[in-house]
Amino acid sequence: MAKQDYYETLGVQKGADEKEIKRAYKRLAMKYHPDRTNGDKAAEEKFKEVNEAYEILMDKEKRAAYDQYGHAAFEQGGFGGGAGGFGGGFGGFGGFEDIFSEMFGGGASRQRVVRGEDLRYDIEITLEEAVRGTTKDIKINTLAACDHCDGSGAEKGSKVETCPTCHGHGRVRRQQGFFMTETTCPTCQGSGKKIEKPCKHCHGDGRVHKKKNLSVKIPAGVDTGNQLRLSGEGAAGENGAPAGDLYVVIHVKDHHIFERDGSNLYCEVPISFTMAALGGEIEVPTLDGRVKLKIPAETQTGKLFRMRGKGVTSTRAGYAGDLICKIIVETPVKLNEEQKELLRKFEESLEGQSKQRPKSSSFLDGVKKFFDNLGK
C-alpha cells in the first residue's frame, strides 16, 4: 500500500514552518500515543506514521530530499539508512525529547523533590477547655532531618557527587523502539546524587525517626472534628524538600451536665412538683458558675428556658450562644403514709376541675374524640 504524504499525515501545508510542524506533531502524538490508546493497533500504526513524518520534515536535508523525490528518496537505504529507523534515538532529531517532556511532565529535567508527609494527631479535651481555649503539650513520632549529617545523608567529610547515571536529574529515560519511558534512577533512587560514604545514623536517607514535643494552642470555641494545622511540623521532606504539616484533630469529651449543639448548650433541670405548681426561684449551673432562674407557677415538664449568652462563643461568628434549660418535674418517691394520705386528699380535691390539669383534660378529650370517630 502506498505511503501517505508526510504533510498530509501531519495535517499541514507543504510550506509549513517548523513551529507549525511541531504543533501538529504534538497534537497527533498525544492523540495516538500508546499510553493513551490502551493497545489500539490502528492507533499504534498511526503513531508510527506521525513519528516518521515528523522525523523527515524536521530535518532540513531530509525534508529537501523528500520535497524533490518523495518517498523514493528513502527507499533502499537512499538517505542514510532510510526513514523510520530512529537509530540515533529521540535526541538526535532536535525535538522529540522536548515535546515528550512537555507531554508527560518534563520529569527528567529536574531532581525529584518530595515534600514531607502530613501527619495527624487526635487529641481529647474537656468541654470547659473547648469553650475557654487551652494549651496542650503533645508528643509525636515523626521523620526529622538527621542532626548528624544535617540532612545531607553523607558522613562528615564524605564526598557528595552528581549521580553518573541520571546526571543529577533523579530520573532516567529509555527509548524502546518508537516509545520512550521515564523511571526513577536505579542508581540514586531519585536523589540525583551519589554519596561516597552514607551517614551511619540515617543510612544515607537524611532523615531519622524521632519523637518530638510540641505545644499546641487550642482556641476557644472549638468543637469535635475541628482541625488545627501546624505548618511544617509534619515529617521532613526528602532531599531537603519542605516538611509536611501536622493536623491536630479535636475530640471534645462528653459532659456530665451539658450537651452541646454548635454554639448552644443544653441541660436538664429537675424541680419538685410543688415548685412546678407554685413557682419559685432556683439556681442552675453554667460554665461561668451558678445563676438564678425564675420558675413561673404552673410550669410543666419539658418547658424550655433560654439563658442568652451563656453558651459557647463561636470561633467564626464571634458571638456567644445560649444555655437552654429543660425543666424536668420530679415525682416524689419513698413516701411515708402521712405524705401519701395528703396526696390522696389533694387528688380528691381536683375531681371535676379539668382546667387545673390541662394536659390530662386535653389527653382525655383526644381519647374520647378518637373512639367517637371509630364508632361512626
Curated annotation (Swiss-Prot):
In residue terms, where are the CXXCXGXG motif repeats? 146-153, 163-170, 185-192, 199-206
Pfam entry (one): DnaJ_C
Q: Does the keyword Cell inner membrane apply?
A: no
Q: Which InterPro entries match?
A: DnaJ, DnaJ_C, DnaJ_domain, DnaJ_domain_CS, HSP40/DnaJ_pept-bd, HSP_DnaJ_Cys-rich_dom, HSP_DnaJ_Cys-rich_dom_sf, J_dom_sf
Please give an example of a GO cellular component term from this record.
Answer: cytoplasm
Against Gene3D superfamilies, the record matches this protein to: DnaJ domain, Heat shock protein DnaJ, cysteine-rich domain, Urease metallochaperone UreE, N-terminal domain
Q: Where in the cell is it found?
A: Cytoplasm
Q: Which domain of life is it from?
A: Bacteria
The J domain, residue ranges = 5-70
Q: Where are the zinc fingers (CR-type)?
A: 133-211
Gene Ontology biological process terms from the UniProt entry: chaperone cofactor-dependent protein refolding; DNA replication; protein refolding; response to heat
What coarse category fits the chief subcellular location reported for this protein?
cytoplasm
Answer yes or no on keyword Coiled coil. Answer: no
Keywords on record: Chaperone, Cytoplasm, DNA replication, Metal-binding, Repeat, Stress response, Zinc, Zinc-finger
Its required cofactor(s), as named, are: Zn(2+)
Q: How does it assemble?
A: Homodimer.
Role, per record = Participates actively in the response to hyperosmotic and heat shock by preventing the aggregation of stress-denatured proteins and by disaggregating proteins, also in an autonomous, DnaK-independent fashion. Unfolded proteins bind initially to DnaJ; upon interaction with the DnaJ-bound protein, DnaK hydrolyzes its bound ATP, resulting in the formation of a stable complex. GrpE releases ADP from DnaK; ATP binding to DnaK triggers the release of the substrate protein, thus completing the reaction cycle.
What is written about domains in the entry's comments?
The J domain is necessary and sufficient to stimulate DnaK ATPase activity. Zinc center 1 plays an important role in the autonomous, DnaK-independent chaperone activity of DnaJ. Zinc center 2 is essential for interaction with DnaK and for DnaJ activity.
Annotated protein name in UniProt = Chaperone protein DnaJ
Q: Which organism is it from?
A: Mannheimia succiniciproducens (strain KCTC 0769BP / MBEL55E)
The upper taxonomy is: Bacteria, Pseudomonadati, Pseudomonadota, Gammaproteobacteria, Pasteurellales
